[in-house]
Amino acid sequence: MGQKVHPYGFRLGYTKPWKSRWFIERDYDKLLLEDVKLKAELKEKLKSAGVSSIEVERPGNKLRIIIRTARPGIIIGRKGAEIDKLKGELQKRTNREVYIDIQEVHKPELDAQLVAESIALQLEKRVGFRRAMRKSVDSALRFGCKGIKVRVSGRLNGNEIARSEWYLQGRLPLHTLRADIDYGFAEARTTYGVIGVKAWVYKGEILPAAKKREPQVATAGNF
């Protein structure tokens, strides 16, 4: 039976960057655990802001957090009150100078994580899974994606036996490294149990920049 590699990890260092960027010689495990907890807590706290991803950088003794979100106004707050409050809480907890960068996701319909969370939210509101899947796929295609696949797994419609169903439109070249494929996962907590939602969005190919030709230096042998 064929196994699937994680689309982001497969392209890591080739077309996708690391989501935690820092180096330390000692106590690596402590900083890694701090990163994991920090991302999980921020994701839960900013649930209503439509957070796509959280990246962490640690230049020196500072902490820089990059949050990609569909609704930046919720995080920033009126006159920056909410973001200042969040920054203060993080500084007190980590004992570091904290910088928070907010990056807006202009097309949430093409962000795989937000697509998966949108479907999960609809399932929690008792919307039919086929209707929720088709609606998200149609929206993504309308906004210009080259291909999209959505998969839901669990006790669909409250059935006794768990199963998986998926819906695919367009192209999805998972084994092409230069393909810009975004991947997202979310969970819908329904009265029948947890339903897992996965989304793959293909946005096109990332082509390397054309190399500039270096001018040839004339030597005695060229004359």
Curated annotation (Swiss-Prot):
Where is each KH type-2 domain found? Answer: 38-106
Its BP terms in the Gene Ontology are: translation
Pfam families the record matches: KH_2 (PF07650), Ribosomal_S3_C (PF00189)
Would you tell me the Gene Ontology cellular component terms?
cytosolic small ribosomal subunit
InterPro entries referenced in this protein's UniProt entry, alphabetically: KH_dom, KH_dom-like_a/b, KH_dom_type_2, KH_sf_prok-type, Ribosomal_S3_C_sf, Ribosomal_uS3_bac-typ, Ribosomal_uS3_C, Ribosomal_uS3_CS
Keyword Iron assigned to the entry: answer is no
Which Gene Ontology molecular function entries are recorded, alphabetically?
Answer: mRNA binding; rRNA binding; structural constituent of ribosome
Q: Which UniProt keywords apply?
A: Ribonucleoprotein, Ribosomal protein, RNA-binding, rRNA-binding
Q: Which family does it belong to?
A: Belongs to the universal ribosomal protein uS3 family.
Role summary: Binds the lower part of the 30S subunit head. Binds mRNA in the 70S ribosome, positioning it for translation.
- Assembly notes: Part of the 30S ribosomal subunit. Forms a tight complex with proteins S10 and S14.
| Full protein name | Small ribosomal subunit protein uS3
Q: Which organism is it from?
A: Koribacter versatilis (strain Ellin345)
Q: Coding gene?
A: rpsC
